[in-house]
C-alpha cells in the first residue's frame, strides 16, 4: 500500500463506481454499514489489523488511506447537499416571486 495513491471511485464522466465487489465484502464479513465507496481500502486494513494483532503502529499506511477516503466521501456528500439546498432555495424563490410579483401594488398582494 505504501508509495501509491488509492484507486479513484469516480469514473471519467463523474459517476461513481464501487471497487470492492459484493462477493469480496461478503467474504471478508464487512458489515453493511461499511460497504461504501471506501470498502476497497477497509478490506486490506482489516487484514493488516488481524495479521498484526491490532498493533496500532503497524497498519498506519492502510489506516491513513482509508480515513482519507472517508474524509473525501464526507466532503463529496457535503458538496452534494449544499448543491441540493441551493437548488431548493432557488426553486422556493421562484415560486414566491410568481405568487407575489414585485411590480404589483402592496394592496393587491395576498398576505395569507
UniProtKB/Swiss-Prot annotation:
A motif (Cx9C motif 1) lies at residues 38-48. One of its GO terms (cellular component) is respiratory chain complex I. Residues 35-77 form the CHCH domain. It comes from the Eukaryota. The keyword Iron does not apply. It is found in: Mitochondrion inner membrane; Mitochondrion intermembrane space. Keywords: Disulfide bond, Electron transport, Membrane, Mitochondrion, Mitochondrion inner membrane, Respiratory chain, Transport. Its main location: mitochondrion. Pfam families: NDUF_B7. A motif (Cx9C motif 2) lies at residues 59-69. It is a peripheral membrane protein. Disulfide bonds join 38-69, 48-59. InterPro entries: NDUB7. The keyword Transcription regulation does not apply. Contains two C-X9-C motifs that are predicted to form a helix-coil-helix structure, permitting the formation of intramolecular disulfide bonds. Complex I is composed of 45 different subunits. Accessory subunit of the mitochondrial membrane respiratory chain NADH dehydrogenase (Complex I), that is believed not to be involved in catalysis. Complex I functions in the transfer of electrons from NADH to the respiratory chain. The immediate electron acceptor for the enzyme is believed to be ubiquinone. PANTHER family: NADH DEHYDROGENASE [UBIQUINONE] 1 BETA SUBCOMPLEX SUBUNIT 7, NADH:UBIQUINONE OXIDOREDUCTASE B18-LIKE SUBUNIT. Belongs to the complex I NDUFB7 subunit family. This is NADH dehydrogenase [ubiquinone] 1 beta subcomplex subunit 7. It comes from Dictyostelium discoideum (Social amoeba). The gene is ndufb7.
Amino acid at each position: 500500500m505504501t508509495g501509491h495513491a488509492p484507486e479513484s471511485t469516480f469514473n471519467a464522466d463523474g459517476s461513481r463506481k464501487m471497487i470492492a465487489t459484493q462477493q469480496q465484502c461478503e467474504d471478508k464479513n464487512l458489515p453493511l454499514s461499511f460497504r461504501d465507496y471506501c470498502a476497497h481500502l477497509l478490506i486490506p486494513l482489516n487484514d493488516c489489523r488481524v495479521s498484526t494483532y491490532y498493533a496500532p503502529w503497524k497498519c498506519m499506511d492502510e489506516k491513513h488511506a482509508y480515513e482519507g477516503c472517508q474524509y473525501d466521501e464526507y466532503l463529496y456528500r457535503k458538496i452534494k447537499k449544499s448543491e441540493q439546498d441551493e437548488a431548493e432555495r432557488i426553486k422556493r424563490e421562484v415560486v414566491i416571486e410568481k405568487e407575489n410579483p414585485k411590480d404589483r401594488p402592496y394592496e393587491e398582494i395576498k398576505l395569507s
